[in-house]
Amino acid sequence: MNIFDRKINFDALLKFSHITPSTQQHLKKVYASFALCMFVAAAGAYVHVVTHFIQAGLLSALGSLILMIWLMATPHSHETEQKRLGLLAGFAFLTGVGLGPALEFCITVNPSILPTAFMGTAMIFTCFTLSALYARRRSYLFLGGILMSALSLLLLSSLGNVFFGSIWLFQANLYVGLVVMCGFVLFDTQLIIEKAEHGDQDYIWHCIDLFLDFITLFRKLMMILAMNEKDKKKEKK
């Protein structure tokens, strides 16, 4: 029997029998909204980097924060769905604008960093998402406390580094932060499943969690690649 003649059953690979059909439909809405956020964020980044019509700064950061709070304060219902999708799109757009300075920095170092970082982030996000979907339910929820503690330590060290100015601490924050965000992809994905199983159908807010995970992963991986590229250029000189 030739093992190469065996057919791969893709339906079996995509079958999540431990997740109820209603939750699977909920996840489809979450990831459809996530895809929308990615396109709108790309448009926001384009506006900052290419057209310079809207620049990243205090106003764009405050705008994204206000939209996020507004979205949180607006209850999920059929009547408010279109309004909340508009708020989600606005938040994603301003988040993309906020990526502008980091994108410009990477372009000055080496433009090839951007597609490399995006593809790397997409692969990491996809792998950890599938791991969370295929794993036994609630198996990664124990990470919540660990991840929040690690995030608090990263925030404190980042604030402390404002005064110390240590490049080593900055780099350590990037690498540790990358690992922590991978953990958040696992945790948030399974948390969304559990919330949906218990009746929480707010797919728009659930999308926010995954979108922020992806953006933070992308930003950290992009900066790691840019700093490594700068170090290589210094060594050549």
Curated annotation (Swiss-Prot):
Keywords of this entry: Apoptosis, Autophagy, Calcium, Endoplasmic reticulum, Isopeptide bond, Membrane, Transmembrane, Transmembrane helix, Ubl conjugation, Unfolded protein response
Ubl conjugation is among the record's keywords: yes
Residue ranges that the UniProt entry lists as topological domain Lumenal: 51-52, 108-112, 161-166
Chain ranges on the Cytoplasmic side, renumbered to this chain: 1-29, 74-86, 134-139, 188-206, 228-237
Name of the featured protein: Bax inhibitor 1
Subunit details: Interacts with BCL2 and BCL2L1. Interacts with ERN1.
GO cellular component, one term: mitochondrial membrane
Compartment(s) where it occurs, according to its Swiss-Prot or TrEMBL record: Endoplasmic reticulum membrane
Cross-link (Glycyl lysine isopeptide (Lys-Gly) (interchain with G-Cter in ubiquitin)): K7
Functional summary from the UniProt entry: Endoplasmic reticulum (ER)-resident protein that confers cellular protection as an anti-apoptotic protein by limiting multiple stress-inducing pathways surrounding the endoplasmic reticulum and mitochondria. Inhibits the activities of the key sensor for the endoplasmic reticulum unfolded protein response IRE1alpha/ERN1 both directly and by blocking BAX/BAK binding. Modulates ER calcium homeostasis by acting as a calcium-leak channel. Negatively regulates autophagy and autophagosome formation, especially during periods of nutrient deprivation, and reduces cell survival during starvation.
Protein's gene: TMBIM6
Sequence ranges marked intramembrane in UniProt: 207-227
Membrane topology designation: Multi-pass membrane protein
Record's comment on post-translational modification: Ubiquitinated by BFAR, leading to proteasomal degradation.
Transmembrane segments: 30-50, 53-73, 87-107, 113-133, 140-160, 167-187
Organism: Pongo abelii
Pfam families: Bax1-I
